[in-house]
Amino acid sequence: MKFLEKLKQAGNRNKSLLCVGLDPDPKLMPVGMSALEFNREIIEATAPFVCGYKINLAFYEALGKQGWEILSETCEFIPRELITIADAKRGDIGNTSKAYARAILDELDCDGVTVSPYLGYDSLEPFIEYQDKGIFILCLTSNQGSTDFQMLKTEYLGQKRFLYEVVADKASLWNRYENIGLVVGATQQEELKKLRLIYPKLPFLIPGIGAQGGDLKATIENGTNPNGELAIICASRGILYARSGSEFAQGAAEAAEQMRDAINHYRKRF
């Protein structure tokens, strides 16, 4: 099944654009609980309210030799009708990029992955060739340092353009399999609105809601397409750690349901 088709089915099934980030932090998890058990309980509690899960690979790499096993088992535990996106931000050349793509899209069998465009098309091609997978290119990120490079102006097709605009245009040109999307932070509302108007058919993976200060209402208004779709709204800490101790899973379920419902409230205009 093509990524966009699966995304639409998952969104319709749970009436949700919400994507929960599975970022297990030992400092915030219940004392004595393994990352795998934490993830399982979070998934069981939140699955009715989401379109999918975004798995930040760094949190698993930080767990050492057991991290890959936990990552793999976490991916297997996610219901197959929901999407799984590996937040890997990979970008390299030649066989290295091919190996990254195999690891994430074959071995883990994730539905999507985030990639960095800094090394150019040949670094992304091994991912893009997985025609049924969603390839999300970092375009305009939610962190403060994003302006260091992404907001620089450069000559492009005879005009001065911001670098993030060049990335978005290249992504659109490379989208021959209709499997490419953009990562655009919820902290960049003016630019988010501009990008959505120019690229109504591209899915946007939108981090930055909650702890990073992104406004949910503005994100829905600016980030969805004319049908109120094609925006994947990411939230991690505000859901995973909504409550502490033994009630963490119930807290996550309530937080996910509340955010799902808030998103749908703002989607009513569509």
UniProtKB/Swiss-Prot annotation:
GO BP: any one term: 'de novo' pyrimidine nucleobase biosynthetic process
Pfam families, per database record: OMPdecase
Family: Belongs to the OMP decarboxylase family. Type 2 subfamily.
Entry EC number(s): 4.1.1.23
Lineage of the species this protein comes from: Bacteria, Bacillati, Chloroflexota, Dehalococcoidia, Dehalococcoidales
Organism name: Dehalococcoides mccartyi (strain ATCC BAA-2100 / JCM 16839 / KCTC 5957 / BAV1)
Protein name (Swiss-Prot/TrEMBL): Orotidine 5'-phosphate decarboxylase
Keyword flag Lyase: yes
Any one GO MF annotation of this record: orotidine-5'-phosphate decarboxylase activity
